[in-house]
């Protein structure tokens, strides 16, 4: 805990520095207004705008407010400031490097998405941080250069001083000696001036301190109506402000923030005056504070004691900027801008869109001109804006006219984000990502595109030429959630997609999907004539929406998707409106291959009728792809359906279930028409998104589970590993009714393994009715990963801990590691469960969440388009959609119930430890102990995350789970004996006690009966961090996790299990003897008590003798403590133990702690003892006063000041109040 130290002539009581909790990575520095108060402090509402220093130039500011250059250098002071400055710059670099690594990780994780605009924004942030890092490194090198020059001048000055002293002390000699003396004196003066000049130059590189007033805290000293004046002096810089205490507990100040330029040789002087009348002012206190500790990367909340008793505290939020305001680089605020997740959240908020950039306007104009050149019709104005911060649909007026900036909606603070960001004006620019080479998405089209993946600014011709030669790579296949069609039209507007490539005739009907495992590349000619007419349709109606075609057999690996790919054999070469058909033969060795050829005949733009033809191949696994033969250049395209050799339609029922359950497939070649086939409603938008997203296929966590609504694309030939593996065209019992629609795309390697693994379910005939297939999907059981149905204990514990960490964010830098590990654990759990939707803690807005946000656009249209005959009364579609949309479809789990239970215990233990943080006053042992335990828990979570690859593999021994940093024989063997025939992650304490007694009971019982049980109970209590009940309790007993066992053993000094048992047995025997009722046994134990054996329990037993023992025992204990305290190791251990006793709930324990501190004469205990004299009960106050008298001159002086203050002021707290007020 860093504290704001004061000048040597003044001592501060409990001067505490906390990290500001207002820094959360969401709100920028200008957005952290008075609404975010300091812990439970009331809100400050200044009546007017804060008085900020005017924006002066650097020279005028330095001459007007800065400290003048010193005439005498102070190298010692400069060394201290330089060390603190380097520490602050290093922290700045580390914070920004961590942010850079997180952004790069987000880029890697998001590359399966089609949000290329979002990736581009991440890339801009990364480059901005890189520029700022280079600026920081240059700034640090400049400071190092100045310091090295200063050190050189210092050595020269010291040498000149030695020369002058040598000539001066000696007898005056010749003229040459006098000349040499004058030369040395002149050199000394020059070096002194050079050092002063370098000091001023270094002082100019210190940056700025931004001070924000948080308020006064004063217990009973602050009354309603009181007025205070605070005057701060820092060199020649001043800040004076006045405030008033309102009746509602609010404090109103006439000024809120200011900027101080750091100085090398000055201290910050703070004077607080209470204004009681026109000429009656009472000075509350005046202090001078050290400022070198304020060079920190993160904002800090400084709590300064104004008076000696600490009854008046001033709270300031101090933020250090390494650069001056006039010297700020453009990228200096890269980490301080709104976080990436916040920007994504505001993207999908219901706010007006941003004005499109010049690149977008040029793109829209180019598309419009291209359409007019082709058929003279205007391009649809209902295309969606591709701006990353725009709303989902834009009218033509909104797209081409300026719109007001949306208010950034700030979510809750995030655990994964590095804080201290500042806003940055978003701008559009060229995408410089990997996917920029292949703008077309995985299924070859993007009618629901969110980003402009590739826009050429050169000319329309260059853009068309570029689009004609682009090919699709594996990365583009892995990206891009792209719903099959648009939502229903709104108020007369008609759906019209924004194609990601520059061809307006890009295909919008083929929405068959593909996996990313062993991805067989499949391409599609975009500029087909009938698709152009679909894009240019202007009449609204359900019949205008092209219907997607899907094949849904269990392991059917077939689809013909469309992309712009020149070298692919399944490509239509387009010249103008002429289509050259190319026939390609698709051969597979798998059991089933479905070739789907969408047959669409468009007679006019107002009568677009989707009629997909579904074909099932025979077991010969050989079929010929359809030949696309354009009949005329008038945008009428007919497609010859492939020959069907198997009369059974495979999997069409499920497709109809997801889109329109009222139109079953009657024959393999029968075209199915659906007037509401594409009906995006608030409950079906996610479903449609998953049906057409290439990154939505079967969950990798369940082997043999295939994607129901989508199939991977088929290249020229596709070979399956096991051609004889049975396949089922409907969901097997292992399937979840909602899982195939919501599972994200796993890693390519995972999908490769999955695609080659056979399905364990037996082959069954395909259902021929969509309602039947949907009913089967709904009735399938939902497996629970935690072993129980709907067990959400792990998810609840994780959410509770992240919510608790949000309350302490920024106050304790030690918690950053824990927060990172908790966020990492959550991401691993969600990744394992196949969850890509956002949680409230991480706000990772994915495509599913985005489509859910857009579903409100089509609520009215869905109601208008729903015909009573289109949906049967008993249709279970609503239930299926609810199960699909439900964010709690599957609880988070590691796949191992025992590991889940162990994690739950650790997460709740962390939440309990967090409650011990943030206490007010000098009693901080419990807080320090809790922070130490939290650091250990962070290492435990890190070990669990590192173990994530083997979560589902049953561990047979503790050696497979944890590893000690040093060799500790016997410990893991003992744990394996405890968990024999049990899971190695958890063990009941009764089982540990029984195993310990069986192994060590015979040997320890020889020394004293029951010693083995006492040793094991002490071990368990130390490992668990809590006392065990002495009597059996109802309900499940306490359990010890392998990670608690491992973490505790790592802290021990004993090298082996045998040595630990022996040492602990000696300590337990000593404590028993000290607590004996026989005075002779107690005195004998005191005489023979070795220094090394007196640990926490032994020291507590000694201190209790100072309260409960007779005079002879008390004298012996005092003598023993004084003699043992001469050793530094024992003194430190005893000091920590006795200070910890001051925070115990038992009054007698606190009294014993006070008396023990007096025995060892610890000046470190003066401040806590003074605090107890003011706040605790009469018995504790009396013991504290007695101990203060024994703490030397300093303790006696503190006691005198305490008595004077208590005589002058009424009692602040009554007996037994034990104030634990927290800021």
UniProtKB/Swiss-Prot annotation:
Residue ranges of coiled coil: 89-114
Alphabetical UniProt keywords: Coiled coil, Cytoplasm, Golgi apparatus, Phosphoprotein
A Pfam cross-reference name: PL48
Principal subcellular localisation of the protein: cytoplasm
SUPFAM superfamilies per record: ARM repeat
Location(s), subcellular: Cytoplasm; Golgi apparatus
GO cellular component term of the entry, any: extracellular exosome
Modified residues (Phosphothreonine): 355
Domain of life of the organism encoding this protein: Eukaryota
Assembly and interaction partners: Interacts (via N-terminus) with RHOA (GTP-bound form); this interaction links active RHOA to STK24 and STK26 kinases. Interacts with RHOB. Interacts with RHOC. Interacts (via C-terminus) with PDCD10; this interaction occurs in a Rho-independent manner. Interacts (via C-terminus) with STK24; this interaction occurs in a PDCD10-dependent and Rho-independent manner. Interacts (via C-terminus) with STK26; this interaction occurs in a PDCD10-dependent and Rho-independent manner. Interacts (via N-terminus) with 14-3-3 proteins; these interactions occur in a Rho-dependent manner.
Function, in words: Downstream effector protein for Rho-type small GTPases that plays a role in cell polarity and directional migration. Acts as an adapter protein, linking active Rho proteins to STK24 and STK26 kinases, and hence positively regulates Golgi reorientation in polarized cell migration upon Rho activation. Involved in the subcellular relocation of STK26 from the Golgi to cytoplasm punctae in a Rho- and PDCD10-dependent manner upon serum stimulation.
Protein name: Rho family-interacting cell polarization regulator 1
Organism name: Homo sapiens (Human)
